[in-house]
Amino acid sequence: MSFVDEAKIHVKGGKGGDGCVSFRREKFIEFGGPDGGNGGNGGSVIFVASSAVNTLLYFRYNQHIRAENGKAGSGKGKFGAAGRNRVVEVPVGTQLYDEDGNTLIADLNNIGQQYTVAAGGRGGIGNAQYKSSTNRAPTYFTYGTLGEEHCVLLKLKIVSDVGIIGMPNAGKSSLLSRCTASKTKVSDYPFTTLEPHLGVAYANGCELVLADIPGLIENASSGAGLGHKFLKHIERCVILLHLVDCSLPDIVSAYELVRQELKLHSQELTGKQEVVILNKCDLLSEGEVREKQKLLESSTKKEVITLSMGDELDSLIVFLHAQVKKAVVTEPSDTSFDPFLYVHYNKK
């Protein structure tokens, strides 16, 4: 299945049903009076964040989303039926922008979170509602109003506890496969991973969602390699798990290159808590591994964990789970986006 993380769509709420002009017609009742009912409201287009979908692939083949129109009113005071809402599931982490992609409309980053993208029109009023002491037989009514209609740009930023980052071929996909049941493609050449992968790891009662982010190379923040397309997915990770290939001749440069690309993409990324792992240590002797570990710790001023292919991973998962909980508690709340200040288009 293709990983689609952007889509431009057209949404339209249902038109309200028209009001009705009708008069009561029964035997022996000469002046029955008006009995035209109101029209039903049009349905709305509603997006719901769901864990059942992972990409925006649905919108590649369904670029026009519209809700049902309301039904017209009828005689005998019958109101028209309301149009059914069009409820569409989107992945958790979906952001809605205006057509130009400049204004954020909604950010659906919690399961079950809803947003009405295009409200339905109001139903028209039947002539029965216009009856008064001075007008016993009104013959006028109102038409139902049109539903809202917009072009919307959808962008997906996957949500995970841990984002696994590093240079191409650093062993990110292998680690994800070992920690979880994710069947990611693994091979000994760069850019094996062409799209983000999610997996859930369990150990000693701890549950952890990990994301394998495609490898970053120099100038990734400017679009080189696969960086420009996938750097944005790191923004939603609580902490970063930075893998460095132990077999590289210059591990410090490899580490700093990835950190630099994160900084160029967004200054906030460099502020995220980071766990550094020296991977593929089984390819070197213990002495060489110890030497490179000290070198990387001296450069990063962080504790560096060593990892080999045959190592047991439960303790690592428990450790990462504790770091995630700590980061969630200490992380300042994001005040840059207020859900009560969502842009809500006016009806046309």
Curated annotation (Swiss-Prot):
PROSITE patterns linked: G_OBG, GTP1_OBG, OBG
GO MF terms, alphabetically ordered: GTP binding; GTPase activity; magnesium ion binding
InterPro entries: G_OBG, GTP-bd, GTP-bd_Obg/CgtA, GTP1-OBG_CS, GTP1_OBG_dom, GTP1_OBG_dom_sf, OBG_GTPase, P-loop_NTPase
Pfam families, per database record: GTP1_OBG, MMR_HSR1
Obg domain ranges (all copies): 1-159
Chain residues that bind Mg(2+): 173, 193
Residue intervals of the OBG-type G domain: 160-329
GO cellular component, one term: cytoplasm
EC code(s) of this entry: 3.6.5.-
Cofactors that this protein relies on: Mg(2+)
Cellular localisation: Cytoplasm
Positions of GTP binding: 166-173, 191-195, 212-215, 279-282, 310-312
Coarse class of the protein's main subcellular location: cytoplasm
Keyword hit for Magnesium: yes
GO BP field: ribosome biogenesis
Keyword match Acetylation: no
Keywords: Cytoplasm, GTP-binding, Hydrolase, Magnesium, Metal-binding, Nucleotide-binding
Top-rank taxon, per record: Bacteria
Oligomer status and interactors: Monomer.
Role according to the record: An essential GTPase which binds GTP, GDP and possibly (p)ppGpp with moderate affinity, with high nucleotide exchange rates and a fairly low GTP hydrolysis rate. Plays a role in control of the cell cycle, stress response, ribosome biogenesis and in those bacteria that undergo differentiation, in morphogenesis control.
HAMAP family reported for this sequence: GTPase_Obg (MF_01454)
Family: Belongs to the TRAFAC class OBG-HflX-like GTPase superfamily. OBG GTPase family.
Protein name: GTPase Obg 1
Organism: Anaplasma marginale (strain Florida)
